[in-house]
Structures are given as structure tokens and as C-alpha cells.
Amino acid sequence: MKIKRYDLPKIIKKDFFIYGKIHLILLLAIILSANSVVIVVYNTRLLIAEEENLNLKTKKKDDEWRNLIIEKNAISMPSIH
């Protein structure tokens, strides 16, 4: 009697591709969606940091503008001598 040998890796691959197509597609979808979430969160954090920097610059410019208005008004006032 001859012992029948099975090619186990081949059988596993065949079963996986026959019965696991949906699982592979879902796994790929999960990985892509997770990557998308990471990229969106990273870009959002960059934009928030940029917005904070722009707000600081705006505040500095606004303060400088107010100081210039005060200086202009002080210069245009007639001196009391």
C-alpha cells in the first residue's frame, strides 16, 4: 500500500483563495481605511498648528497696528508749551 502525500501549503493556499476572498477584500479595506484615518489626523494636526501660528502672527500685527495708531495720535497732538 502506497502512502498518499498531500501538498499542505498548496491545499492551504487553494482553500484560502477559494473561501477567503471576502476576508482578503475586507482586510485590505480595513488597512486602507486605517491608513486614511492616520493620514487625515496627521494633516489635521498640521493645519491646526499652522492656524495657531497664523493666529499668533495676526495678534502681533494687530498689537503693532494699535501701537502705531497710538503713536500717530500722540505725534499729531499739539504740544502744550
Curated annotation (Swiss-Prot):
<feature type="transmembrane region" description="Helical">
    <location>
        <begin position="22"/>
        <end position="42"/>
    </location>
</feature>
<dbReference type="InterPro" id="IPR011922">
    <property type="entry name" value="Cell_div_FtsL"/>
</dbReference>
<feature type="topological domain" description="Extracellular">
    <location>
        <begin position="43"/>
        <end position="81"/>
    </location>
</feature>
<dbReference type="GO" id="GO:0005886">
    <property type="term" value="C:plasma membrane"/>
</dbReference>
<feature type="topological domain" description="Cytoplasmic">
    <location>
        <begin position="1"/>
        <end position="21"/>
    </location>
</feature>
<keyword id="KW-1133">Transmembrane helix</keyword>
<dbReference type="Pfam" id="PF04999">
    <property type="entry name" value="FtsL"/>
</dbReference>
<protein>
    <recommendedName>
        <fullName>Cell division protein FtsL</fullName>
    </recommendedName>
</protein>
<keyword id="KW-0132">Cell division</keyword>
<keyword id="KW-0131">Cell cycle</keyword>
<keyword id="KW-1003">Cell membrane</keyword>
<dbReference type="GO" id="GO:0043093">
    <property type="term" value="P:FtsZ-dependent cytokinesis"/>
</dbReference>
<comment type="similarity">
    <text>Belongs to the FtsL family.</text>
</comment>
<dbReference type="GO" id="GO:0032153">
    <property type="term" value="C:cell division site"/>
</dbReference>
<keyword id="KW-0472">Membrane</keyword>
<keyword id="KW-0812">Transmembrane</keyword>
<comment type="function">
    <text>Essential cell division protein.</text>
</comment>
